[in-house]
């Protein structure tokens, strides 16, 4: 029996989760929301997390009805992510570990998502599509590692969506990706956008620049261009949102299908914040059904960054015998998914 | 590898007293794990003198020194707040804990 407390704060969400043998005891979270047109910066995000984190720890222990002595391990996000917010989680985790004399474990953020997705959905050995504001990877498990078969070669798909939301000044509440999704539902007018799949990899920076020009034609005037008649451009924001989703989600479906074919896999698991998107889930489900496979996805309680996923991944590590010296309890902005030895899986 | 500091660096020594040597040691361990970002060219050395945490900063530039000290204080305050809220010394125990439970993993819940 392993009871784990997890601390997650690698981006603009700060969350604390408590889990015991696969049973969710607490999962509390706070989101740092910036005004429309602005992204969250590391310093301000860390300030928000510092103000919220101790209250969240206390409320999670109350919700779980536990004393500190009931905990077996404290887990925190070691990386990847933004350094100042990561540091907030790490410092609190270290301090609690020493105060309560409880072992400390650093968890990879991506593996937290994967293990939480596997637990909630019951998927055994799926091809994993991990899509969020900071990561875009196609992952499959093999020989004690979560192998990265394909990934973005520049910005994450969620980053592309978030920055486009900034361009058209969409609200960041509850999240820019969610607001793009809602706006896209009111249009079915497709605009042709660059489709940039490179084998198993994808690229989103070109699409972002292209659609930025569509959204704001007057901005960034190309001085070399001869003055032409202004193009007839009656695209609405909904049209742009719809087309952006159709294009980038089709790209994600393609690389996922290619990985399924390579691995002979019959299951797909979508994790990460963009995995909340129902249109992405629908497109992926269509592909899976055509291949005779099955799609697994979770709702926003677990898709979006949360402390519970760190607690669960950490509990799995702890149960399989992983221990971390206190001197190694630093944070790192880059922490590749395949760097972690998956000692808790035997297959 | 620590970056090279010029012969006449800008320096600052900060002494932080704690209630007990144990709390000072906790802060020393918690705050000593992280290295300063390499490109800042700042050297940070932590040491303990009983219940006082001593931090020595050295830097080429005053602005880097100021940034490093500001960041350190943010981390220190968070560590202290955590100790204040969850440490043993808290009289009114919202989360009761006694020394007898330290290190044990007792649980009254049935599996």
From Swiss-Prot, chain A:
Reported cofactor(s): a divalent metal cation
CDD domains: ASKHA_NBD_OSGEP_like_euk
Source species, domain of life: Eukaryota
Compartment list: Cytoplasm; Nucleus
InterPro entries cross-referenced by the UniProt entry: ATPase_NBD (IPR043129), Gcp-like_dom (IPR000905), KAE1/TsaD (IPR017861), Kae1_archaea_euk (IPR034680), Peptidase_M22_CS (IPR017860)
Name of the top EC class for this enzyme: transferase
Catalytic reaction equation(s): L-threonylcarbamoyladenylate + adenosine(37) in tRNA = N(6)-L-threonylcarbamoyladenosine(37) in tRNA + AMP + H(+)
Cofactor binding remark: Binds 1 divalent metal cation per subunit.
One GO molecular-function entry: N(6)-L-threonylcarbamoyladenine synthase activity
Sequence positions that bind a divalent metal cation: 109, 113, 130, 305
EC number: 2.3.1.234
GO biological process: positive regulation of translational initiation; tRNA threonylcarbamoyladenosine modification
Assigned keywords, A-Z: Acyltransferase, Cytoplasm, Metal-binding, Nucleus, Transferase, tRNA processing
Residues annotated as signal peptide: none
GO CC annotation terms, alphabetical: cytoplasm; EKC/KEOPS complex; nucleus
Residue positions binding substrate: 130-134, 162, 177, 181, 277
Similarity comment: Belongs to the KAE1 / TsaD family.
Subunit structure as annotated in this protein's UniProt entry: Component of the EKC/KEOPS complex; the whole complex dimerizes.
Summary of the function given for this chain in its UniProt record: Component of the EKC/KEOPS complex that is required for the formation of a threonylcarbamoyl group on adenosine at position 37 (t(6)A37) in tRNAs that read codons beginning with adenine. The complex is probably involved in the transfer of the threonylcarbamoyl moiety of threonylcarbamoyl-AMP (TC-AMP) to the N6 group of A37. Likely plays a direct catalytic role in this reaction, but requires other protein(s) of the complex to fulfill this activity.
Annotated protein name in UniProt: Probable tRNA N6-adenosine threonylcarbamoyltransferase
UniProt source species: Drosophila melanogaster (Fruit fly)
């Amino acid at each position: 029996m392993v009871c784990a407390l997890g601390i997650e704060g690698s981006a603009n969400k700060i969350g604390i989760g408590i889990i015991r043998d696969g049973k969710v005891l607490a999962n509390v979270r706070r989101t740092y929301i910036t005004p429309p047109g602005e992204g969250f910066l590391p310093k301000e995000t860390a300030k928000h997390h510092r103000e919220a984190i101790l209250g969240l720890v206390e409320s999670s222990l109350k919700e779980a009805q536990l004393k500190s002595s009931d905990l077996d391990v404290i887990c925190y996000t070691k990386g990847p992510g933004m350094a100042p917010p990561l540091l907030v989680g790490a410092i609190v985790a270290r301090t609690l570990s020493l105060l309560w004399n409880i072992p400390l474990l650093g968890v990879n953020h991506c593996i937290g998502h994967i293990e939480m997705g596997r637990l909630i959905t019951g998927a055994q050995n799926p091809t994993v599509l991990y899509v969020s504001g900071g990561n875009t990877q196609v992952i499959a498990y093999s020989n004690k590692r979560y192998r990265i078969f394909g990934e973005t070669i520049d910005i994450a798909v969620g980053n592309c969506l978030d920055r486009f939301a900034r361009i058209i000044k969409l609200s960041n509440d509850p999240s820019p990706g969610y607001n793009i999704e809602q706006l896209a539902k009111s249009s079915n007018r497709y605009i042709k956008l660059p489709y940039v799949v490179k084998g198993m990899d994808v690229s989103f920076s070109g699409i972002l620049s292209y659609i930025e020009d569509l959204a704001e034609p007057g901005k960034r005037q190309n001085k070399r261009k001869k003055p032409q008649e202004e193009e007839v451009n009656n695209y609405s924001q909904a049209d742009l949102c719809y087309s952006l989703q159709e294009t980038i989600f089709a790209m994600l479906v393609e690389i996922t299908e290619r990985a399924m074919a390579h691995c002979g896999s019959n299951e797909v698991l979508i994790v990460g914040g963009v995995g909340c998107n129902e249109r992405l889930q629908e497109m992926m489900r269509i592909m899976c059904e055509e291949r005779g496979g099955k799609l697994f996805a979770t709702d926003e309680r677990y898709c979006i960054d949360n402390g519970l996923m760190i607690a669960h991944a950490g509990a799995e590590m702890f149960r399989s015998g992983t221990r971390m010296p206190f001197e190694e309890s630093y944070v790192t902005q880059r922490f590749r998914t395949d760097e972690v030895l998956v000692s808790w899986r035997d297959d | 590898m620590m970056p090279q500091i010029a012969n006449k660096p800008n320096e600052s020594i900060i002494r932080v007293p704690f209630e007990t040597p144990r709390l000072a040691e906790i802060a020393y361990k918690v705050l000593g794990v992280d290295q300063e970002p390499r490109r800042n060219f700042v050297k940070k050395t932590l040491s303990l003198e009983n219940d006082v945490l001593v931090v020595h900063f050295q830097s080429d530039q005053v602005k880097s020194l100021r940034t490093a000290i500001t960041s350190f204080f943010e981390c220190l305050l968070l560590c202290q707040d955590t100790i204040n809220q969850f440490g043993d010394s808290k009289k009114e125990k919202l989360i009761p804990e006694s020394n007898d439970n330290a290190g044990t993993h007792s649980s009254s819940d049935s599996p």
